């Protein structure tokens, strides 16, 4: 019987994102041995990355107009890059953090499989338009937060699924509207699949954040602002997809705080354009 955490580390090290997504999906939901206590040594060079896309600060990425083929494909590429990084993050949280309950690892393995599907759907759609993943520059925002939270599983689940990925719940409807407005109904269908699954992924983050807070004797709501400050998480700007956030397990108190004037200040890293929301959501 294969061991899940070592397998996820091996997959994370793969440089080819297409091969990585294929292998994650091929492993599937088979019976796994899970060594929850073993501290795995960290190899150099993770995550494995291809030579393309070129990585740069998101503020240096200048998307073309959406009504051009390059602008259309560029927006899809930005979302595809988010999903590629989401595969890496799900694999990383499994191998990196020992000592969690068995179900923690199985939950994130399910997330990894769904993120791999999302990446594949978007990559295939890009190819149908004459482009491919790697044809446009991309940023490292999601993995940068992973690096900052690499030593604390509480910070990781608080600030990746519950913060950056939850921003994807907010951005998804507007991105879908833009793509459908230029006639890309297939992209709209894919984004519907992603939104459905991402609600579940954020719910996994919420569930394990609450569990970890309970284990450490912390109040989840009171603890969160301190984590965002310590790890330099971006403040989020509305509009917020409150229905999706509620479905993902955010409490009524959290949703009310999210709508408070102090929580909707615009940080330098987020602007009001739909395309930039897609670029910076993760």
For each predicted feature, which ranges?
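Non-heme di-metal
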Residues: 1-282
